[in-house]
Structures are given as C-alpha cells and as structure tokens.
Amino acid sequence: MRKGPAVGAIFIILLPIFASACSSEPREYDFAVSVAGGPEGWPVWVEEVIVDQSWRVPAGGIEHGFDQHPPMGGVAVLGPKPAPGEIYARWFSHRTEKFYDVALSLPEDLDDKLRKWYRDYPLEDYSHTLIVGFSGKGEALAWWKAFCSTCNYDRSHDFSTPLVENVKGEVVEGDPGRYNVRTGEHVERGTIPPPPMWLIRQSDGDAGN
C-alpha cells in the first residue's frame, strides 16, 4: 500500500521530462526540391547538392531556369524533412570550364516562416518546393514556392519568395576534360561558343568524356 504514492510521484516527475523531449523534436515539412541552372547560354552540370550534410538531391545537366522568377528546374520529391539550414553544391560551367562550389546558409528564422506559409498555403491545396539554382556564371540562389494545385490555370494564387540571392560560388579545382563530350555537344548545338581550352584539348586529341 505504501508503494502507491511513490509510483505516482515518479510518474508525475517523468511525464514532463518525456513531454519536453517530444516537443524538442524538429517539425518536419512535406516539400520537394527543384534545381535550376543556366541561364540560357550558360549551361551547367550540377555534380552534387547536399542539404544539411545529410541528404542529397539529384541534379545533372541543366540549361534553363536560373533567371526566371521564381527559378524553375527539375523536381525531386524526397519526403518530409525539417526546415533546411544549409545547402552545399558543386557544379561545372560548360561555358567558363570552371568548377564552383558554395555553401548557402538559409535564413535562421526559416522554420518560423515555414510554419506560417504552411498555414497560409495548406498542403490540401498547395505543393511546396525549395528551389535552388546554380548558374554558369558561378552564382547561386535559393527560393521557396507554394504552387496551387486546385486553382486550375489561375497562377495568381501561387506564392514564391527568394530566400538567398546573388551568392558567388568559389572557383575550385577540377578537370574540365571530364566534360569534353558534353561541352562539345553544347558547342555543336550553338548553345555556347567554343571555350578556348576546349579547342586546345580537341586539337591535342584529348576527347575526354
């Protein structure tokens, strides 16, 4: 009979601790990720995009979308995630034949903003997308977009806003010869003028990949 109060006391003490632990779990949001490139005449090959050092976004060759408002690119649906904080990316510009990388720091209050945006643009009617863009000029950006899926063709109900813009990527080491074939395809199509070093490699018989 004497054990009853003790057990009750333990329960009362542990319950707030358990509730506190649950409340500390980060809120997750259901959104997709879109990767834009370009702009036109500045095609890129995005080698990797890593969010919060934990999950990767597929990318590859991209020619358009960087200079649109909002930017546009291929979309990857990755499932619910916490509000992103940092995006690392590395990409190659076929026109400059340079490699760039960048670590985009997203706004510290993004989680608070997402809570509001998901209330204003609920998932029942909207699909949310984190948009990241990497240009052939070595620039990077990030936007957020909510696309109304129940508004037919009326795009006036969509929402989009820049998160980070006009960020300069750092030129890093890399072998442009790895992209000889893809760069050559852009030259043949007239997408870009022949890069000087690409012409030299071609004359030296370095066909590359």
Where are these predicted regions, by residue range?
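Bacterial N-terminal signal peptides that target proteins for export
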Residues: 1-10
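C-terminal motif of bacterial Sec signal peptides marking the signal peptidase cleavage site
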Residues: 18-21
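Bacterial signal peptide processing site
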Residues: 23-25
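Structural motif
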Residues: 33-44
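Tryptophan-paired
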Residues: 47-95
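Edge beta-strands of extracellular beta-sandwich domains
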Residues: 98-105
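Compositionally biased low-complexity segments at domain edges in trafficked proteins
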Residues: 114-189, 194, 208
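Preference for solvent-exposed, low-hydrophobicity sequence contexts
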Residues: 203-206
